[in-house]
């Protein structure tokens, strides 16, 4: 929480003067005093590093880095988007708390981050004011970047408009995320939120990582190729399937295979037809030559019958 912590108790070193007690002015309370021991969510890269004039950048503006270690003025960090790990100077990054509270950047850098590609209308950040230490500014992406000063009352409550005060910055963000209430637009997403990588889906145990998604159709019956080849329509698409599911090379291979098997099947059909003709011809021939023999037998039987009648 960023709500104000209880104020410090009266110091014992205060100097007593007469009946009045004069206390040394307490240092201006920072609303983020409870973040000093809090680990930041991430580091936001403010400039390409190294400079493109020196070498290809390892980290680019707008990237989000996860801190590995603090090396005293340098950070050892890893990019949340590319996974690259390297050192980067502290002046090239800003520490980010709660996703929207930026430390270590000014007005110009805030505008650069909010104007990055894919930044949505309503993206915002809260940053420390450059002109008044201990005060903060709200920067919002609209048609152009708008800046609103966040004032603080003596009781350490915060406000943008005096008619509406908040006990902490989180309450302020929550309110203006629901209604614009005088701002250029409603606060939608924290700055750089669109650069957060989406969680990677765990691969199924039945599929190897990186295996392509395949579409499975009904098993093709190669015995039906001859029947599918009949007719001009079957010759063009013998498989009768959606050609978009097959690559051009695969379709060419299938066409070549079908042309080869088509020649073999046609030869087989011709041989089969020839055999059937020979068989039918021989059958006709045997029936043709059997007719005279039948006549001879019938004639012989008639002669014998005639002789028998004559004898009687």
Curated annotation (Swiss-Prot):
Keywords, alphabetical: Cytoplasm, Endosome, Phosphoprotein, SH2 domain, SH3 domain
Region (SLA C-terminal): 206-312
Region (Disordered): 1-33
Pfam families: SH2, SH3_1
Coiled coil among keywords: no
One MF term in the entry's GO annotations: phosphotyrosine residue binding
Domain of life: Eukaryota
GO biological process, one term: signal transduction
SUPFAM superfamilies associated with the record: SH2 domain, SH3-domain
Known function: Adapter protein, which negatively regulates T-cell receptor (TCR) signaling. Inhibits T-cell antigen-receptor induced activation of nuclear factor of activated T-cells. Involved in the negative regulation of positive selection and mitosis of T-cells. May act by linking signaling proteins such as ZAP70 with CBL, leading to a CBL dependent degradation of signaling proteins.
PANTHER family xref list: PROTEIN ENHANCER OF SEVENLESS 2B
Name assigned to this protein: Src-like-adapter
């Amino acid at each position: 929480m960023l709500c104000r912590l209880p104020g410090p108790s009266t110091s014992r070193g205060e100097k007593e003067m007469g009946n009045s007690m004069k206390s040394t002015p307490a240092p201006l309370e920072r609303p983020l005093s409870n973040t000093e021991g809090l680990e930041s969510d991430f580091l936001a890269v403010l400039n390409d590093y190294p400079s493109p004039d020196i070498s290809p950048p390892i980290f680019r503006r707008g990237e989000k880095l996860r801190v590995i270690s603090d090396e005293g003025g340098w950070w050892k960090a890893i990019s949340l988007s590319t996974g690259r790990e390297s050192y980067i100077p502290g002046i090239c990054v800003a520490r980010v708390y709660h996703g929207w509270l930026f430390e270590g950047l000014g007005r110009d850098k805030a505008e650069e981050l909010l104007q990055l590609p894919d930044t949505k209308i309503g993206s915002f950040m809260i940053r420390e004011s450059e002109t008044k230490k201990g005060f903060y500014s709200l920067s919002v992406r609209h048609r152009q970047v708008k800046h609103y000063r966040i004032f603080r009352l003596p009781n350490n409550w915060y406000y943008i408009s005096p008619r509406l005060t908040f006990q902490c910055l989180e309450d302020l963000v929550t309110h203006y995320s629901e209604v614009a209430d005088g701002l250029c637009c409603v606060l939608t997403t924290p700055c750089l939120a669109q650069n957060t990588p989406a969680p990677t889906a765990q691969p199924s145990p039945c599929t190897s990582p990186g295996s392509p998604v395949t579409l499975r159709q009904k098993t093709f019956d190669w015995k039906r190729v001859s029947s599918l080849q009949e007719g001009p329509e079957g010759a063009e698409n013998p498989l009768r399937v959606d050609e978009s599911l097959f690559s051009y090379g695969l379709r060419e291979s299938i066409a070549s295979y079908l042309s080869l098997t088509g020649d073999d099947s046609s030869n087989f059909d011709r041989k089969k037809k020839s055999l059937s003709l020979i068989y039918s011809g021989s059958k006709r021939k045997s029936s043709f030559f059997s007719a005279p023999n039948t006549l001879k037998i019938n004639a012989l039987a008639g002669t014998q019958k005639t002789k028998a009648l004559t004898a009687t």
